[in-house]
């Protein structure tokens, strides 16, 4: 009898849950599947030339009027503000509010915005539509709403946790990244946002994705906190065959850092939103790949089955590593993808694109499955994205991790004690970790290292680092053809015991 009562309660709970909202991801999926069966219609811009041709400084003058934040008059900790169209944000997106009883379009009004010195005709913008939206929440202080989510442009979105500033971005989907045919950028064309209650600590957003060769339905559950976590569910439909599908893509920027110092004199030791790709492979191996700003497009691939996690991290958060008071790269979040369920066979790819300045996002990573269904068939992906400054949680708890990677001109000390370059490239890699710090300084730690065909190792030494209470690996290579990339891998061992994650690196061509 007790079991029957429990089942009845569960059924009632299910019914109450399903009827609590007038909308679900299945509604978006129906629309996405219908769209996939039709020809693609490119979005049409309705933007007056005064807004389309404006410069960035002019666009920055258009500010949302905070007093008119959506849900200001509702008892909810979440508020919405909207982005005006302008520059290359020149096509409107539809934004809807979902309640328990209705789905209602949020209408554009120029009264939402302060236009600064931007001259415009009010009649031409009265039905313009929004470019995107942002979510505000009292994440840092109970009496102040701060931005925690920004959804603007293509399928990009940025998310913040407590005490963080915007850095890298996530995307809904990537298509044909780094292929000669050129990348296709899907866009979120419509959003549905559930109006949260006063006690809600999470916000649910649905999105309809569209592009020439794919459509998709997305559900994002935003859970703000010290680490803000986004629970993602997607249902993707191909319109046509694609060369490569990028699932759970992350986009970041790396201009220079300790492994690739600035080519010009700069007071900043490093300038990047992320400095490495971290991977937890399906077999349990942890891999750390420092990022580069190459002179030519570079792609690195890590084949595996059922990845357990991957992300672009900002390891090393001391202000002295960046010295930038304006842009605070030390406060920019890492993003970690945790897949749910089995993703099958495929690979994690890292794409590095040359850039001369920090305004260009030149780093992309994603999961790309080996097998794709026929057009019209549904693909399901579930995962979480954690936006964090606690990188100590994002490596193996019982193994050492790479603290820093430095690159140098290789040299040899002469009999007169003067160092002379010997035509090699040297890598200085510091490993540290809680368990490693417990090892005696005379532990016989060694490095298992290997390179691709384009180099030979001329020095592989490991020494105790009393400053970090870890071990430093010095790897010196003779590169055969500098016009080609050079691959290398290494891990610290003590006999048969592996002590560290795998350090994986690609020396760019012409470096």
UniProtKB/Swiss-Prot annotation:
Annotated signal sequence range: 1-22
SUPFAM superfamilies per UniProt: E set domains, Galactose mutarotase-like
Gene Ontology MF, one: catalytic activity
Entry's localization field: Periplasm
Coiled coil: none
Lineage: superkingdom: Bacteria
Keyword annotations: Periplasm, Signal
Any single Gene Ontology cellular-component annotation: outer membrane-bounded periplasmic space
One Pfam assignment: MdoG
Hydrolase is among the record's keywords: no
Protein's pathway: Glycan metabolism; osmoregulated periplasmic glucan (OPG) biosynthesis
Keyword Amino-acid biosynthesis: no
UniProt cross-references to Gene3D superfamilies, sorted A to Z: 2.70.98.10, Immunoglobulins
GO BP field: beta-glucan biosynthetic process
Family: Belongs to the OpgD/OpgG family.
PANTHER family: GLUCANS BIOSYNTHESIS PROTEIN, GLUCANS BIOSYNTHESIS PROTEIN G
Function: Involved in the biosynthesis of osmoregulated periplasmic glucans (OPGs).
Protein name: Glucans biosynthesis protein G
Originating species: Klebsiella pneumoniae (strain 342)
Gene from which this protein is expressed: mdoG
């Amino acid at each position: 009898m007790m079991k029957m009562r429990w089942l009845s309660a569960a059924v009632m709970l299910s019914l109450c849950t399903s009827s609590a909202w007038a909308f679900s991801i299945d509604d978006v999926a129906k629309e996405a599947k219908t769209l996939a069966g039709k020809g693609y219609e490119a979005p049409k811009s309705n933007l007056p030339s005064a807004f389309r041709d404006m410069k960035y400084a002019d666009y920055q003058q258009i500010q949302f009027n905070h007093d008119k934040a959506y849900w200001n008059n509702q008892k909810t900790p979440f508020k919405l503000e909207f982005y005006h169209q302008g520059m290359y944000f020149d096509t409107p997106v539809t934004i809807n509010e979902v309640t328990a009883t209705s789905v209602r379009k949020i209408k554009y009004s120029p009264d939402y915005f302060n236009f600064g010195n931007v001259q415009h005709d009010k009649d031409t913008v009265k039905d313009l539509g929004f470019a995107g939206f942002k979510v505000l929440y009292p994440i840092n202080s109970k009496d102040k709403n701060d931005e925690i989510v920004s959804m603007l442009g293509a399928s990009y979105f940025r998310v913040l946790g407590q005490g963080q500033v915007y850095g890298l971005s996530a995307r809904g989907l990537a298509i044909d990244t780094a292929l000669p045919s050129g990348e296709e950028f899907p866009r979120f064309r419509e959003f549905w946002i559930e109006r949260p209650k006063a006690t809600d600590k999470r916000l649910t957003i649905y999105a309809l994705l569209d592009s020439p060769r794919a459509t998709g339905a997305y559900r994002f559950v935003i859970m703000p906190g010290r680490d803000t976590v986004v629970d993602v569910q997607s249902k993707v439909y191909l319109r046509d065959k694609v060369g490569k599908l990028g699932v759970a893509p992350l986009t970041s920027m790396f201009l220079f850092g300790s492994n690739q110092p600035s080519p010009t004199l700069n007071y900043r030791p490093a300038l990047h939103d992320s400095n490495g790709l971290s991977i937890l492979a399906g077999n349990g191996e942890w891999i750390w790949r420092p990022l580069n700003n190459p002179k030519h497009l570079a792609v690195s691939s890590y084949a595996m089955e059922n990845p357990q996690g991957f992300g672009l991290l900002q390891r090393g958060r001391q202000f002295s590593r960046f010295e930038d008071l304006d842009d605070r790269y030390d406060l920019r979040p890492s993003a970690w993808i945790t897949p749910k369920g089995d993703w099958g066979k495929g690979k994690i790819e890292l794409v590095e694109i040359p850039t001369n300045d920090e305004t260009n996002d030149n780093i992309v990573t994603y999961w790309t499955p080996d097998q794709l269904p026929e057009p019209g068939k549904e693909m399901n992906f579930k995962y979480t994205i954690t936006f964090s400054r606690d990188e100590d949680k994002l490596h193996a708890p019982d193994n050492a991790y790479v603290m820093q990677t430095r690159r140098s001109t290789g040299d040899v000390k002469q009999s007169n004690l003067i160092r002379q370059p010997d035509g090699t490239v040297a890598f200085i890699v510091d490993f540290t970790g809680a368990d490693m710090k417990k090892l005696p300084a005379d532990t016989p730690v060694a490095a298992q290292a290997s390179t691709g065909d384009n180099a030979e190792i001329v020095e592989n030494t490991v020494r105790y680092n009393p400053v970090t209470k870890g071990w430093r690996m010095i790897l010196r290579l003779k590169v055969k053809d500098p016009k080609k990339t050079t691959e290398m891998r290494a891990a610290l061992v003590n006999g048969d015991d592996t002590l560290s994650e795998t350090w994986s690196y690609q020396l760019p061509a012409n470096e």
